[in-house]
Amino acid sequence: MSGNTFGKLFTVTTFGESHGEALGAIVDGCPPGVALEASDLQHDLDRRRPGTSRHTTQRREPDQVRILSGVFEGVTTGTPIGLLIENTDQRSKDYSKIKDQFRPAHADYTYHHKYGIRDYRGGGRSSARETAMRVAAGAIARKFLASQGIRVRGYMSQLGPIDIAFKQWEAVDTNPFFCPDPDKLPELEAFMDQLRRDQDSVGARITVVADGVPVGLGEPVFDRLDADLAHALMSINAVKGVEIGDGFASVAQRGSEHRDEMTPQGFLSNHAGGVLGGISSGQPLIAHLALKPTSSITQPGRSIDVHGEAVEVVTKGRHDPCVGIRATPIAEAMMALTLMDHYLRHRAQNADVEVSTPRLG
């Protein structure tokens, strides 16, 4: 009811605020016997961690995760896994001047009206700082999924007006943009440097792909795999749109083009993005998400205060000029959590189902 838990069988509940003591998560439903240690989670957290390049927020959080429960002698026990990350680099004084003002396009106004109180320090619970716990929980899901041959990866496919064609997975983790085309890096660097001089921000597009997904994941009609994946990705801060497969480009396609024809050797295309009728087809699961430009910029903006009076807001603090730069690990985590939950749900109901039809490659 309160919206802090994700999943049905594999559940993740997060807690904590941007400038609070710590962030935490309870991960429940993980099968026992999964080899797990903090370093498995730390790898993905380090990919998301703030302050790692001049193009992201300069808030420097080590994001060292602690596993408090649910793991014994290096393996999961099947009981709830408690995770904790302490906040160490808060600068709450940066927000003292806006405690009675609403930053344009932020959650300040809506949180104030919904709860009657808000933690104005860095956005409190509405801050993307919360996503650190999603990444940690997602790493647990990814560890299990890998044992089943499922791999989740993502990359930046657009930064502002700059389209980025996919070239190679090997390049993605070698640069701060998660860019799959090394030849694009100078253009991205120059664009971000100019953006900082302009004291402005920009949006981005992230693509996430899961390979090795078996046929059959998804629970029609209301818990279709693509519906739950869209829900998961839309829950990420600043995401304003999600596409599965060709998404909105399908509007201009004809049926003769869009249909993914099949032969005994396999599918001839994947316009559907790996989902047919809400159920995984065994093809790569492909999703794209659009992130808006943050309104946390140093240019003055018109707004109101808690009394309804007109004010001019200048946002202080340390912010990402493009929140999409660090969104790839978060999107990967949410896809992994969705797949983990549906894998367990499918196994619970349909583990004994057998068909004579071969699986297409």
UniProtKB/Swiss-Prot annotation:
Cofactor(s) essential for the protein = FMNH2
Query: Could you cite one Gene Ontology molecular function of this protein?
Result: chorismate synthase activity
Q: What class of enzyme is it?
A: lyase
Sorted alphabetically, the keyword list is: Amino-acid biosynthesis, Aromatic amino acid biosynthesis, FAD, Flavoprotein, FMN, Lyase, NADP
Catalysed conversion reaction: 5-O-(1-carboxyvinyl)-3-phosphoshikimate = chorismate + phosphate
- Which residues bind NADP(+) per the record? R48, R54
Residues given in the record as FMN binding sites: R125, S126, S127, N237, A238, G277, K292, P293, T294, S295, S296, R318
Residue spans of biased composition, Basic and acidic residues class = 40-49
What's any GO biological process attached to this entry? chorismate biosynthetic process
Q: Name one GO cellular component term.
A: cytosol
Free-text remark on how the cofactor is bound: Reduced FMN (FMNH(2)).
The record ties this protein, via CDD domains, to: Chorismate_synthase
- Matching Pfam families: Chorismate_synt
Q: What does this protein do?
A: This reaction introduces a second double bond into the aromatic ring system.
Subunit and partners: Homotetramer.
Designated name of the protein: Chorismate synthase
Source species, please? Chromohalobacter salexigens (strain ATCC BAA-138 / DSM 3043 / CIP 106854 / NCIMB 13768 / 1H11)
Record lineage: Bacteria, Pseudomonadati, Pseudomonadota, Gammaproteobacteria, Oceanospirillales
User: Gene behind this chain?
Assistant: aroC
